[in-house]
Design a protein with these regions (language model features):
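Small/aliphatic-rich secondary-structure junction motif
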Residues: 1-53, 67-71, 75-76
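Structural motif
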Residues: 5, 109-110
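Active-site charged/polar residues at nucleotide-handling catalytic sites that mediate phosphoryl
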Residues: 30, 102, 106-107
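Short, structured coil segments at secondary-structure junctions
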Residues: 30, 128, 135-137
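Short secondary-structure boundary segments
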Residues: 38, 114-116, 144
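Charged helix-capping and loop-helix junction motifs
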Residues: 52-54, 58, 93-97, 125-129
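Charged docking surfaces used in two-component/phosphorelay signaling
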Residues: 78-98
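Glycine-rich, Arg-bearing micro-motifs that act as flexible, cationic patches
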Residues: 110-131
Length: 144
């Protein structure tokens, strides 16, 4: 099993991009391994497929950005089905759980993610970031 010291969780949003850059700078400084994760959640197969396609685009861009910075970024794309419309906060918890599961699986030292996601309208810490910070067993760096 491959081990990554850094796991950067991104959705391609402004804050996600800040997290990507921060994670790559740390990776380059310490010459360590990094993986980028995108969690595609959908209640219908077509919706999930759309989000998986977006995730592939986002992760390909992250790999290109990493290459331009001299960092090799590995991609993790996770597709999750939700059978019905989730209640408030359920989607954030599902995304956070997928990030945390990947962190455990790959024995990650530090998770890096944006303070708000693409769907966040609250100026406070984003719901996914908050869930990850609360439940992570490893260090979490939140980019703002």
């Amino acid at each position: 099993m491959t081990k990554y010291e850094i796991l950067v969780a991104t959705d391609g949003s402004e804050y996600g991009k800040k997290a990507e850059i921060a994670a790559m700078k740390i990776t380059r400084s310490y010459n360590i391994r990094i993986a980028a994760i995108y969690v595609a959640v959908g209640s219908k197969d077509s919706e999930r497929e759309e989000r998986v396609a977006k995730g592939e685009e986002v992760l390909n861009r992250v790999v290109e950005t990493g290459a331009s910075m001299g960092v090799e970024v590995n991609k993790l794309l996770v597709g999750v089905s939700m059978q019905r419309m989730p209640q408030q906060g359920a989607m954030a918890d599902t995304i956070a759980r997928a990030i945390l599961d990947a962190a455990d699986k790959y024995k990650v030292h530090t998770i890096v993610l944006g303070g708000k996601g693409e769907s966040e309208i609250n100026p406070e810490l984003g719901s996914v970031a908050l869930a990850v910070v609360k439940k992570a067993k490893c260090t979490v760096l939140v980019a703002r």
